[in-house]
Amino acid sequence: MTDPHDQTGARRVFEILQEPDWFSGLSPREARLLDGGLAFHCLARPGERIRATVLRTDGPHLPSLTDHRTQRIEWADDRRVVGTIEAHATGTPVPTTGVVDVVLDLGGPPGSLMRLELPPGRVHAVRSVVRGRAPVVFDVLRQLRTDRLENRRLSRPIPRVGRADVTSAGSSRGSTKAVLFGLHWLELGGAEKWAAETIGMARAAGLFPIVVSDRPSGHPDIARPVFDDALVIPLTHPVPAEHESRVLSQLFERFDIRGVHVHHCTWLYQRLPWIRAQYPGTELVDSLHVLEWRTGGFVDIALRMSNVMDQHHVISPQLRDYLVDQQGLPREKVSLATLADLTVDPSGQRAEPVSTRKAGDPMTVAFVGRFTQQKRPYLFLRLAARLRARLGDRVRFIVHGDGELASEVRADHARLGLAGSVQLRGTDQPVAQTLDEADVLVISSDNEGVTLTSFEADAHGVLVVSSDVGSQASVVLPELLLPRAPLPFLRAAEDVLVSLCEDAERAAHLLVEQRGKVDAFADLPRARDWTRYLYERWAS
């Protein structure tokens, strides 16, 4: 049997003293989570023998791999001991005496994590009940708060960290050329899909990928081929302070990290000033996707850290204009390079922008996306109920996705009486099949950058109707852009879709116009080209 560790970069930083029999019983996902935990603890304690007690559960519990709980030799009653394993950092003698005990909890299976328990506290409980029983009312209040925060954020300067004046050569480095990546989590949708693409590009350029993530997750995609031969460390928080600098120092001492590329990773963003001070020759860049008015999100963090960073890559004109025109960053420091070709090759085979709906056929309206508060699937279901009441059998619906609101989506589906008209599809079915059947894709999100599904829909000859958020106006026709606020969104979406259903000739004309708009956006600089040039320079 092939050792699962041979498929990752883990062997570069630690060795297992004796592989136990139970190891072959781990799923590939669990084996890689264990790899990440062992890599972290061996790097945090080079020269010591690490003895890990490995746990798992069937319940909806996230992994615990690097946080302070790993130092406690007790655990909850619903955890099962998988076994124990010993390892030590490579490049150091095997200790003959003494051992450091850690407890690595691999968590529950990915399916159970869709039913995560609420965070503790009455506020979270009340919030969940209100959202479940009255999601539109909840959303109305949420959007009013967003409006206030947006106006406040536009009028206030964002503080910046001090500039780095380090001129020394910095600390010692290893010899293997590498890139340190920061990811949100290992769930490959949206921004993470682009992050995974860059990891493959780094490998193709001859750079070794080192990946850290900082968002709680079961990391269902950690076993994807893109992470083969990479060193992947899924952080769980809070990480003991004394381990942070040791792990980062060990990575830089073992590898020649030519650059850091941050993709939505708060932990790594906040360590950039330290990296700049200790390793000033390392280039620091990020990729930014979306403005988040409620929290500021990653754009605010990037602005705070901009004085120690070399370049910001943005995927939309909206982000470029915000950073340059409103926040005053030098234009040469902000690179616009789009993801128009990430999931669709604009020069490849695409459906003709011609409606395939025959006379008498119902119009098929689709929702494709994660079931999250941001994507607002509950709005789509209420839109479907309105259209069903108004158009009857002349319209049908597909809701394609999964996520943390899955149980609420199913409850809404039943409560609104949509079983006969709205088909629910999971992520086990191809999105391409849904888009082949659809005439219109509705994007009901309350925030986006530029959705990849907009490009995919156009490639399938599907009209896109979208809330007017982020830079969606770059690819969606003005007459198909809808208000962000939920009640105006529902009213406008209902009118637009009734019009498209009743006027097939107009729908066909709009499809041609949409293709032209998408093609114009695709003519902007491409993120693949920008990144390829960057990595080739780092590798030289």
Locations of the language-model features?
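Nucleotide-activated donor-binding/catalytic signature segment of Leloir-type glycosyltransferases, i.e.
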Residues: 229-236, 410-426
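Non-catalytic membrane-proximal stalk/linker segments that position and tether the catalytic domains
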Residues: 2-178
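Aromatic "clamp/platform" in nucleotide-sugar-dependent glycosyltransferases that forms part
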Residues: 446
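A short, active-site helix/loop in glycosyltransferases that binds the activated sugar's phosphate group
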Residues: 137-138, 296, 309-334
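A conserved mid-protein helix/loop that constitutes part of the nucleotide-sugar donor-binding site
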Residues: 192-197, 367-386, 404-407
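Short hydrophobic beta-strand element within catalytic cores of glycosyltransferases
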Residues: 463-467, 473
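A charged, aromatic-enriched C-terminal amphipathic alpha-helix characteristic of glycosyltransferases
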Residues: 502-538
